[in-house]
Design a protein with these regions (language model features):
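Ligand-binding loop in jelly-roll beta-barrel domains
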Residues: 78-93
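Glycine- and acidic-residue-biased ligand/ion/polar-headgroup-sensing regions
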Residues: 46-57, 62
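A short, N-terminal "cap"/entry segment at the start of jelly-roll beta-barrel domains
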Residues: 1-25, 60
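Conserved short histidine dyad/triad with adjacent acidic residue
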Residues: 27-44
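Short acidic-glycine-tyrosine-enriched beta hairpin
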Residues: 63-78
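A cytosolic small-molecule/anion-sensing beta-strand core signal
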Residues: 53-54, 69-70, 88
Length: 93
């Protein structure tokens, strides 16, 4: 079944948007942020890749800030705390 990932994420003024697309062989987590919204510090139990579809975010990991814009991606190791701050309206996977 064909699905368009960007159509799955609807930005909300009241909170960040989280959409999980999964089947037995993979999981994609879509995140939508309005400017100023935050994905609080957390860890992941498996390696992950963060991809910025549109917008710009500040990604913090190991005390280092990384500004990521549309098209950028970042490899996140397992069990390392990280967080995301939306600098503008943004969509990530």
């Amino acid at each position: 079944m064909k699905r368009i990932l960007k159509d799955e994420i609807v930005l909300s003024e009241s909170s960040k948007t989280v959409k999980i697309l999964a089947n037995p062989s993979f999981k994609v987590i879509g995140l939508g942020f309005k400017k100023g919204q935050v994905l609080e510090k957390h860890t992941t139990s498996t390696k992950a890749i963060l991809i910025v579809q549109f917008g710009e975010v500040e990604f913090l990991m190991d005390g280092v800030k990384h500004n990521l814009q549309a098209g950028a991606f970042f490899e996140i190791p397992e069990n390392v705390e990280h967080e995301v701050h939306a600098l503008v309206d943004s969509c990530l996977y």
